[in-house]
Amino acid sequence: MDILSQDIMYLPGVGPHRKEILGKELGIHTYRDLLEYFPYKYVDRTKLYLISELSQDMPFVQIKGRILSFEEAEMGKRKKRIVAHFTDGHGVCDIVWFNGTKYIYQNYQVNKEYIIFGKPTFFNGRFQFTHPDIDDASQLQLNDMGMQPFYVTTEKMKKAGITSRAVEKLTKMLISKLTEPLEETLPPFITTHLHLISRDAAMRKIHYPKSVDDTQRARVRLKFEELFYVQLNILRYASDHRRKYRGYIFNRIGAQFNWFYSHNLPFKLTGAQKRVMHEIRADMASGRQMNRLLQGDVGSGKTLVALMSMLIAIDNGYQACMMAPTEILAEQHLQTIKEFLKGMNLRVELLTGIVKGKKRQEVLDGLIDGSINIVVGTHAIIEDKVQFQHLGMAVVDEQHRFGVEQRAKLWSKSENPPHVLVMTATPIPRTLAMTIYGDLDVSIIDELPPGRKPIQTIHKYDDQMASLYSGIRQQINLGRQVYIVYPLIKESERMDLKNLEDGFEAMQDIFPEFQLSKIHGKMKDKEKEAEMQKFVCGQTQILVATTVIEVGVNVPNASVMVILDAQRFGLSQLHQLRGRVGRGAEQSYCILVTNHKLTKETRKRIDIMCDTNDGFEIAEADLKLRGPGDLEGTQQSGIAFDLKIADIARDGQIVQMAREEAQKIIDDDPTCQKIEYNMLWER
């Protein structure tokens, strides 16, 4: 039996109770799990500080000296605070304990020399160390200490005595049991070419490093390995998919496309739109299924590109569908497409949950007999009952709301899988796109159509509301509409957030001369629909809402977006909300309202929003500030991945390196037959 598959209970120092806590809190069940539970930081244990050199902003430090005396203070019922006065000859500090009286007096003696390791804090005129690590100075060789690893632990673990130091001791115990070198997981041609240390050396050095260089080399090796296998699996999946699924060959540009291009094109295509259309046309004529991700900021003209792609399918005798994440968005796409296709003899229908009875049957019949050219809808389109005569093109809007299973259901609607174009207005940084959407080819529309004015973003504090209300009034009197966004629907006892209901009433009092709508996540779809419709039609001038308006709503007349408690939102979310305005020819504004208590990170977020409208710049900054968040581990190609040490946000260079090495192997062995790569496919 492989030693790393051993149950963690059998490691000396664990036992049944610790096994249960390690399993529940950290998911550590085997020796392998413990070995792959990596430290989050290190502290240099080769250096000693003098008490006279200590300062409050120091992290963990160690000092050498002796205990002068002990002192006790009662702290309520049967609780004591024990203080040891400690000197190194250059100053005096205190060691403080709040429990463990018997242990302390049994193990630590006055005038004996100890090495103290902990974080210094300043209290009552002198530095103190609370519950530090204490070692007998005569038994500790500093040169052997190297870098001390620190492991993330939970409150439950600490209560059970499983501290970072305890995890460190267990890991060292495990490493001492590994008498044989760990099996290598990367082929020699990769480790040699990239100068990576062996897996065995990396695992030992990451838990028991002697120097900073040890930690760096170990981390690079293990991060590369993790990211390499993610990329290899993604590229292998994409390669298999391309070989298995033939695509329809759409090499004809016919009457519908040409008429639209000559008569109905609302504006001259931007250079970016032309480039993307060229990429899409090449895919559709290639004989293999198109799987393309189309990224573009709000208002960049993605829908127009998608429609032109659908017209190519129609000219080649096939049908097209467009899936949206919400009914509101599906209806807006339907109206937009019908407007674009005015005067053209094409049948475009809606299929969502609200299309029922006779009308629904008409749509289902029209899809089967081929009389419907384009259907726009929600997930209702992928229901088993929905069948097409010839589905050749599928457009999916806002991909992160549709997983790989939904895409696969679309493929089953036709003899060959339809060409798939995935649209997203959420800009995805390159390193993340490479991992999350690694099986899709990526196109980017990075220009706005002519005539669009950049949105002005302004930061205001919550004590400047009077001038803000005056500005809102001015805009509405000019005939514009306004969004006011709150972060939560229910009050939180822990956070001073405004309640949307109270906010709505307050806004009615402040703007009695205007009509207001409200939308929040707790409302039924029909209620939301009705309130939204009032705003879209211009019956109401102000929409008070939570972030349910984040995706897709298009009201060209809305020129002001006010985001209250903006410090509570992430960068990408703020950018998405801002994208609800700026859709008409008039100047638009996004007002970020915060309190004065801003952290350094929050201030940075607000500054970035005010400085740029570039979604990709914002996405990169958000990834660095916040990390990949929900996207991590939800690989869209259907390949799950769990990153234990790599960080897509900060390890872009290693992601790129891993991608290049994986691509070389797939190019050299697309069918995974070559013997020299066997170890890679067996993992």
Segments (PLM) and residue ranges:
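Long, highly charged, low-complexity intrinsically disordered interaction regions
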Residues: 1-12, 24, 230, 240
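OB-fold nucleic-acid-binding modules
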Residues: 37-68
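Short, surface-exposed secondary-structure boundary micro-motifs
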Residues: 66, 119-120, 233, 566, ...
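Upstream accessory/linker segments immediately N-terminal to the RecA-like ATPase cores of bacterial MutS
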Residues: 73-264, 668
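N-terminal pre-Walker A segment at the start of P-loop NTPase domains
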Residues: 263, 267-277
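Inter-lobe coupling/hinge segments of SF2-like helicase ATPases
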Residues: 275-278, 289-607, 671, 683
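C-terminal accessory region of SF2 helicases/translocases
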Residues: 585, 589, 598-683
